[in-house]
Amino acid sequence: DHPAPALAAQAHYVIPELQTDDAWKSAKLIACPGCYPTSIQVPLVPLLRAGLLKPEPGRLIINSYSGVSGAGKKADVAFLFCERDGSIKAYGIPGHRHIAEIEEQFGVAAGQPVVVQFNPHLAPMHRGIATTIVVPAPGVTVAQVEAVWQKAYAGRPFVTLLKSGEFPDTAHVANTNRVSCSVVADARTGNLIITSVIDNLLKGAGGQAVQNLNLMMGWDESEGLR
């Protein structure tokens, strides 16, 4: 159960790069997205809005890898770095708590229900999220995807679009508010493979909150985040 359902009903859910108008800036309460959903929605929502992707239920497969800081600061042997070093493990499959958030926002973007297969993993790094998305998209080209991204993110300081065949690296976004994305097409399978990385503690959490505050106050969105 939500601890404050009355407040939840008033909140505006905001990834600033995905907002289509400025109405949210006058809101009293902003709900900042989760870390995994941010790494997933930034590359996919513009494509769903454009109608490029129409995945069948369960055919949109998302594998994400998070650093141990994603578990918070609770004292748990499983999350000690000495326990995780040299080891990767899946967790929360099926039914991770972020699935509802992801599917809700994808449904809004696509104008119809979208069912995802989300597979989170715990990786041996302090911070960062690496996401790989596999989606059937026969006939959709890399150029079409890149054109949608370029239109959606023109002038946005925290989105880096890499050339097809270049793959984002968590080390390149660590300690920043940036998200980096790329796409390749697999002609053999008819799938698009989209990759993205963020810092789970900044773009995936506190940094995005500061970015939202900056925009609400009419300040430069990168204030305090450069």
Predicted regions and their residues:
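Short glycine- and Lys/Arg-enriched binding-loop motifs that mark or flank ligand-binding interfaces
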Residues: 33, 63-66, 124, 200-202, ...
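C-terminal substrate-binding/catalytic lobe of Rossmann-fold NAD(P)-dependent oxidoreductases
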Residues: 56-64, 68-194
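Low-complexity, flexible helical/coil segments
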Residues: 10-15, 19-20, 69-71, 95-102, ...
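Alpha-helical scaffold segments in soluble metabolic enzymes
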Residues: 42-46, 101-105, 144, 208, ...
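NAD(P)-dependent Rossmann-like dehydrogenase/reductase catalytic/cofactor-binding core
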Residues: 178-226
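N-terminal Rossmann-like NAD(P) cofactor-binding subdomain of oxidoreductases
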Residues: 1-86, 91-93, 111, 184-187, ...
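A generic structural signal for alpha-helix starts
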Residues: 38, 139-140, 200
